[in-house]
Amino acid sequence: MYLKRKIDDYLNDWKRSDDRMPLIIKGARQTGKTESILHFAAENYKNIIYINFALEAKYKTILSGGYDVASILKNITLIDPNKNFIPGETILIFDELQECPDIATSLKSFCIDGDYDVICSGSLLGLNYKKIHSNSVGYKKDYEMHSMDFEEFLWAKGYSETHIKDMLQ
């Protein structure tokens, strides 16, 4: 069962944005980053490419041909020929960014290319920006996700917006 989170509205606004850039979602472990991203992707995209660098170390080589979109997509396809990329309908989700921090360097290329939406997720624990070749400043957005707050807890318990508003006054 999916629990509504505040990031849901942020992700929907990001998707509707005309100047949508790749997104990095950071936060402590076990806060629901991956679950929220995958739920959003399933609701909004026909094609989801999900790569978890911690569980699938073989994907750490996708930058071997450079940081350009064509090289990265080619390398992903060489690892798994069943992964298809449909411009305008595909989202790439790079999870556990701290295991392959240089993927952040490629975000500039994805932003300029514009054919694919990209969300990266990573734990603040172990994400060392000093190890990143180039951080794609100006070509990405950052969002920090926190543990469920009281309002989100009330949503999960089934309280209506009216009841929550009354309680929080």
List the predicted regions and their residue ranges.
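Phosphate-binding site recognition
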Residues: 1-169
